[in-house]
Each structure stands twice: as C-alpha cells, then as structure tokens.
Amino acid sequence: MKHLIPVLLAALFLPALASADETVLRVSAIPDESPTQLQRKFAPLGAYLEKQLGMPVKFVSVTDYPATVEGLAAKKLDLVWYGGFTFVQAHRRTGNAVPIVQREEDATFHSKFIVPANSPAKTLQDLKGKSIAFGSPSSTSGHLMPRYYLMKNGIDPEKDFRQVAFSGAHDATAKWVESGKVDAGALNESVFQKLLDEKKIDASKIRVLWTTPSFYDYNWTVRGDLDPKVVEKLKAAFLALDYSKPEHKEILDLQRTKKFIPTKVENYASIEEAAKSAGLLKD
C-alpha cells in the first residue's frame, strides 16, 4: 500500500456513476467497519442531510480505502468520511480535497494495542517475535500511527515481529486477538470501546497493552470543486447537530460523538509527517 500506487487502481471498485453529478450528493466512507454497520451509521445522517440540503443523498459503498480516494479524485464522490491518513492521501491525490468538520474527539484521538487477557506481554518490547494484526494498510488508527509509534519505540514491524497481518477493519482486528489468531492487534480506540459496550467482544478475554499519544484523525471531506453553497450548507448542517435534541441524538450516537467541530487541512500535517517517517508516503 506504499506510495499511493494502489489508489490509482481503486476506480475499478467504484460503481459506474456519472462524474460531477450535482443533483445528488454522493457520500462514502472508508470501510473501517463492516458494510452493515456503515450503512446503519449513515441512514439517519443521510436523511438529515437530505432535509438540510434539499437534495437527494446517496451512500456509495466501496471495497477498500483507496477506492474512496480515487472516487473523490474522479468526481464520483462528493463527501467522504476519512481517517486522517486517508485524508492526507486524498489531499495529495486531488490537490484540493477539503476537510470541513470532525468529531470533537478526533482532535485528540488514540490507537490501542490489545492482547489476549492471558498474554504475558507487559510492554511493546515484549511483542517482539510475536504476531500482530493491523486493520487496513491505509488506516490511520489501525496501521499508520501504531506503526509510527512502534518505530519510535525501536521496533521494526517487518524485522521484529514473527508475522504482520492486515485484518481489513478494526472490529476484525479485535476478533482476531480475542480468538488467539494473533498475539496482538492495533486498532481505533472508539471502535474498541463500542465493541466492549455492545458486548461484541468478551472483555474477559482481551486487554489493552499500550495506548498511543493523541493525534488528529477522522473528518468529513468534500471534493475541492463541489459547489461552495453546498459545502457551506453541509458544514452548517453538521455543526447544527445538537445532542440535547432527541432527533439529533440518534445521529450523533451512531457517529460516536456528541458534537462536530470545524477542521482544516493544517491539522493533518503531523499525520503526513508520520506517514513519511513510517515509509508509507514519499516526499
């Protein structure tokens, strides 16, 4: 997944949609969770955006992270839910992708390294010689930042682990660790907590080994040449979501936040530098 090469191939996985169709807002999201969960999260938000914009809103499923980048570049997508690293890739690929809002939590996001509850590991160093699972190769919290902090701690994943595997999604990583398929996994803190809260993983079989320092992560990004009036309406719609209103609470709960806040390109400079340091992006 290095150097953005797969992004150029990702259009093969996108539906055959007309480019730059401004009669329908085409929305997508990086597939960091199961397709069923992504559709469930988007349904009430999509209905809300339709009312606020006065135009149809369509969710476009994709098969992998690079497909969202190529979709935005090819004007087949208008609004995308990105992790920080995939946003950086989209901005480099298009030159004008604009992040408009993020969840309040995304200004201070973390990744978790998890292990089976009975693992003898006490530090990251104890994982040397073991197997580890990341999420998608393009995931910020499921690959880039965990890899970056492993390297900062003197651990080279390709040299120091017995096996490096990619589960494809945060929930899959947790399941792999819970089942003992791998000795450790790195994933998004928000998804990990959701899995625990919903009892989709057994808290008695898994524990957190290490938590990364904070970083900027997810955001909603628009293609740079989208009608400015639509962009402003979108931004206003997200910022108007109020957790105290019952009709908004469901939307925000599914997005795992209580509030959206404005964001900007500059917030993701540290993500870009981390990707370069980890060898996942060229200068």
Region spans (language model):
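Acidic, polar ligand-binding/catalytic clefts
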Residues: 70-126
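Short helices/loops that flank or line small-molecule/ion binding pockets
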Residues: 66-80, 93-94, 125, 169-190
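Pocket-lining segment of extracytoplasmic ligand-binding domains
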Residues: 119, 130-229
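An extracytoplasmic/periplasmic, membrane-proximal ligand-sensing/linker region
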Residues: 22-28, 33-44, 217, 221-283
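Short coil/turn segments
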Residues: 32-35, 105, 114-120, 135-142
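Extracytoplasmic small-molecule ligand-binding "clamshell" domains
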Residues: 21-86
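Positively charged n-region of N-terminal signal peptides that target proteins for export
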Residues: 1-4
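Bacterial N-terminal signal peptides
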Residues: 6-16
